[in-house]
């Protein structure tokens, strides 16, 4: 259904979020979509985004992976557009994303080529036709692309003070960025393109820091039915690594990494296939801290907390047990 409404744009589904409860929804760290979020317009964070969007015309949610950026952008977009799917669009930037994808490109047809409107231009034109309605563009992974090249001449005119001023796009057509178009974007502050994004948007849009949230994680683990003692040990490790992240921001771990955590087995999977690599990368030049975090993770599990039983009479120290 959504694909029919916004052809040519990569849409993102609720399955990407892994939502199922309010806490799980807040923890959704994958790219979000406009499919009935469980956080409503009355959520304080959504209200903050809406308020700032009205002042600046655009809001950037900036934070490490797993901090619910995309989900809150999606929830705010729905609220701003009163749930009308034709009034909001989602795009995801990447390293090869260009002006031709976003604003105006060419598409082949019999006998030559014709201009093809990108998602930004389409939404601009729609918003101009209905100035009393709010339209929203959500850009996921803003810092993954060369934003100056992607926005082109429009970069100047997304600024609130320059809305409604006419300018020409690549085919010579005169357009304007209307005041009723809101731009919401997400970005990872540790991406390579962050400096360019900051330079382009720091005067134009508001920015909200999205940080790892212990309270959201605690609620999420409770909703998942995790044993209280195990949950507390996970929270202790979560605090520990994010404490290190104050000096090494690349080590930040968002609460959404634990969205599927229910028991010891699921925690081991999260470590073996995700967190282990994050810790190794963040502390590849700091073996002491890396070892400390690995040891602290092992102590989440009760078996690591119990002292090794003394060998029985006649047993040879270090010899394998009968069960091995």
Descriptions of predicted regions:
Residues 1-324:
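C-terminal regulatory/interaction module of P-loop NTP-utilizing enzymes
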């Amino acid at each position: 259904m959504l694909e029919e409404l916004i052809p040519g744009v990569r849409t993102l589904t609720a399955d990407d979020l892994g939502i199922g409860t309010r806490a799980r929804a807040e923890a959704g760290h994958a790219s979000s979509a406009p499919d009935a979020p469980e956080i409503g317009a009355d959520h304080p964070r959504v209200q903050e985004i809406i308020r700032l969007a009205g002042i600046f015309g655009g809001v950037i949610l900036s934070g490490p992976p797993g901090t619910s950026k995309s989900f809150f952008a999606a929830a705010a977009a729905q609220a701003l557009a009163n749930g009308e799917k034709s009034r909001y669009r989602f795009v995801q930037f990447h390293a090869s994303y260009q002006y031709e994808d976003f604003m105006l490109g060419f598409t082949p047809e019999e006998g030559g080529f014709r201009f093809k409107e990108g998602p930004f231009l389409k939404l601009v034109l729609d918003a101009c036709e209905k100035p009393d309605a709010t339209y929203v563009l959500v850009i996921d992974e803003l810092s993954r692309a060369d934003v100056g090249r992607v926005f082109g001449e429009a970069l100047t005119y997304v600024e609130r003070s320059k809305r409604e001023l006419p300018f020409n796009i690549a085919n010579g057509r005169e357009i304007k960025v209307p005041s009723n178009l809101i731009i919401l974007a997400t970005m990872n502050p540790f991406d390579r393109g962050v400096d360019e994004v900051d330079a382009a948007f720091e005067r134009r849009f508001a920015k909200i820091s999205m940080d790892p949230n212990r309270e959201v994680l605690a609620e999420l683990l409770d909703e998942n039915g995790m044993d209280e003692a195990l949950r507390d040990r996970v929270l202790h490790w979560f605090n520990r690594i994010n404490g290190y992240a104050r000096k090494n921001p690349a080590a930040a771990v968002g609460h959404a990494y634990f969205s599927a955590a229910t028991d010891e087995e699921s925690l081991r999977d999260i470590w073996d296939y995700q967190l282990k690599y994050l810790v190794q990368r963040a502390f590849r030049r700091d073996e002491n801290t890396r070892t400390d975090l690995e040891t602290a993770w092992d102590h989440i599990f009760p078996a690591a907390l119990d002292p090794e039983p003394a060998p029985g009479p006649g047993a040879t120290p270090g010899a394998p047990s009968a069960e091995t």
